[in-house]
């Protein structure tokens, strides 16, 4: 992956990124599908960038019910909020949805100016603030999608956002049916029934993860 295309390293040249990775003591790790990357209750000092694959962010209540909070696509940053708060236990679990490669960087080295006084280190910190702002936006969007009392309302809210982002009424969603139900905080079987009704009503068409809105 070209790191200059990621949010965290946006605006930096390849040579600058290479220099920064040395200063940040960055390491790369691989995870197999289903493997836990970071666990709820753990404390982390590392920011992660997903280089390849896909990861899912979830949380479990005391009864064992799972809620999907979001996904991590290639180039995306995760765990930055917890890493920036010393001693803060994670409230979520990050798992590999498929075979995944991740770049980890120590947040202390990211926030502190290195001994080499890299002139581009300030840009990195600004980018990190932007990443944190985007994370808050994503959480706000999930609140919006789950605010409707009806399952159809939640589905349409989410599909509408996906269509706007894709710039098309036909798009792929990153979740399977169970993950989508968890993300929208609804029962999977009931949600699947509602999807079938929406298809019969001529509102949507779908084939696995591809959704087409009939507008």
Annotate the PLM regions.
Residues 23-24, 42-44:
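Short, small/polar residue-rich loop motifs at catalytic or cofactor-binding pockets
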Residues 1-33, 82-86:
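Cyclic nucleotide-binding regulatory module and flanking cytosolic helices
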Residues 55-67:
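A short beta-strand-loop-beta hairpin characteristic of the jelly-roll/cupin
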